[in-house]
């Protein structure tokens, strides 16, 4: 259930479809924690939908926590028509379009082999017993039968190859003659059975959280770096990291995907086991003031601070600790302006001093050039002066104090 709505954009999300469509739900006594997530969005304007009808998709996801049981969340949030998924499987990935022998498990939905997901809805599979180690890659395969789909739900920038093949071949050890996908379609999460002390961090952000310009298929986003560090820390190995970044996303207004304010319930409160929230968002709100295409682009620091405070306050109401991350430098980026830089510096001062957040993660200080604080340290700049490269993401993930997640 959605627990609180913030902002002015109402995003209809139904997390449990009716039993008439999906059958029985999972046992209420089972406790779960999210181990992987991707924030759903409508296929972006200018990007052609892929006609996934009569195709098998094999999507590769990198989980954080391991577990003995797992369940997979499928989504039709932005669909205009019911979405039927059948012959779904989960296995350990063997790299590329192959799966590890002996690890393939069929997924069911209320005991059935297929599910019909209503427009606007998301559903979990039944739990399946698969021993998945932490920080492993899962291959989630499913067949999309011939059907009318006027709109598709996906996560645009996966930074991870997935695969599509003709026909129903979801159980195949290798997808032969598969095409490569750069997005995740119809998937939004994986939960694992919660071990003692299991809890989750949500990283809410834009392309810098999504991992733009990091090496593909290498899991070098800053949330990945944080997740790997946690697994090496005594007492914190059961803390997972859920990446809810969307490239181009904003705090206040829709641009690429729903705004941070409007997707807060779905991407934070509806995730299982969330105890901590890291918010790194606002640079796109600021950047678009330099190339305004409408009144929604005309914002000031006070409005952005208000939006961030709304997110923090709503999380606090649900017992979630909130860590504010300062906005990284963007001098030299295509939408840089002196006015925008003044706004970024003001928002960062507010993040550091307002007391709204339980703690501050100073990504600005970690990544900036000491000789010119408006710009990235050249060693961390991917080259577009807006995003870090692998070294920058490593510095960000390594610069987070793990003590923030001890209680």
Which residues fall in each region the model found?
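Glycine- and acidic-residue-enriched helix-capping/strand-helix junction motifs
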Residues: 211-224
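Bacterial N-terminal signal peptides that target proteins for export
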Residues: 1-11
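Alpha-helical scaffolding within the catalytic cores
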Residues: 185, 223-230, 256-272, 306-310
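N-terminal secretory targeting modules
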Residues: 2, 22-204, 214-217, 235, ...
């Amino acid at each position: 259930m959605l627990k609180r709505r913030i902002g002015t954009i109402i995003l209809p999300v139904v997390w449990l479809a009716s039993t008439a469509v999906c059958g029985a739900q999972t046992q209420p006594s089972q406790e779960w924690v999210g181990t992987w997530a991707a924030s759903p969005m409508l296929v972006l304007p200018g990007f052609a939908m892929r006609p996934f009808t009569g195709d098998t998709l094999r999507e590769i996801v990198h989980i954080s926590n391991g577990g003995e049981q797992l369940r997979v969340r499928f989504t039709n949030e932005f669909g205009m028509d019911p979405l039927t998924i059948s012959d779904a499987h989960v296995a350990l990935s063997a790299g590329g379009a192959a799966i590890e022998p002996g690890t393939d498990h069929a997924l069911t939905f209320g005991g059935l082999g297929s599910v019909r997901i209503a427009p606007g809805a998301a559903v979990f599979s039944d739990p399946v017993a698969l021993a998945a180690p932490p920080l492993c890659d899962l291959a989630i395969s499913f067949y999309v039968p011939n059907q009318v789909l006027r709109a598709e739900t996906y996560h645009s920038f996966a930074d991870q190859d997935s695969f599509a093949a003709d026909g129903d071949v979801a159980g195949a050890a290798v997808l032969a003659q598969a095409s490569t996908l750069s997005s995740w379609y119809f998937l939004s999460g994986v939960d694992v059975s919660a071990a003692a002390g299991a809890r989750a961090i949500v990283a809410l952000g834009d392309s810098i959280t999504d991992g733009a310009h990091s090496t593909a298929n290498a899991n070098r986003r800053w949330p990945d770096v944080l997740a790997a560090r946690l697994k090496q820390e005594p007492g914190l190995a059961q803390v997972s990291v859920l990446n809810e970044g969307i490239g181009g996303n904003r705090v206040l207004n829709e641009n690429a995907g729903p705004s941070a304010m409007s997707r807060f319930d779905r991407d934070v409160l509806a995730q299982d086991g969330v105890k901590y929230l890291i918010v790194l968002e606002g640079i796109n709100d600021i950047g678009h003031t330099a190339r305004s295409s409408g009144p929604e682009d005309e914002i000031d620091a006070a409005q952005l601070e208000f939006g961030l405070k709304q997110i923090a306050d709503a999380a606090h109401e649900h017992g979630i600790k909130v860590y504010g991350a300062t906005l990284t430098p963007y001098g030299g980026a295509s939408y840089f302006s002196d006015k925008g830089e003044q706004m970024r510096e003001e928002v960062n001062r507010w993040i550091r001093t307002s007391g709204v957040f339980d703690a501050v993660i100073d990504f600005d200080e970690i990544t900036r050039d000491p000789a010119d604080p408006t710009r990235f340290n050249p060693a961390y700049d991917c080259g577009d002066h807006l995003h870090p490269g692998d070294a920058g993401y490593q510095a960000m993930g390594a610069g987070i104090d793990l003590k923030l997640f001890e209680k």
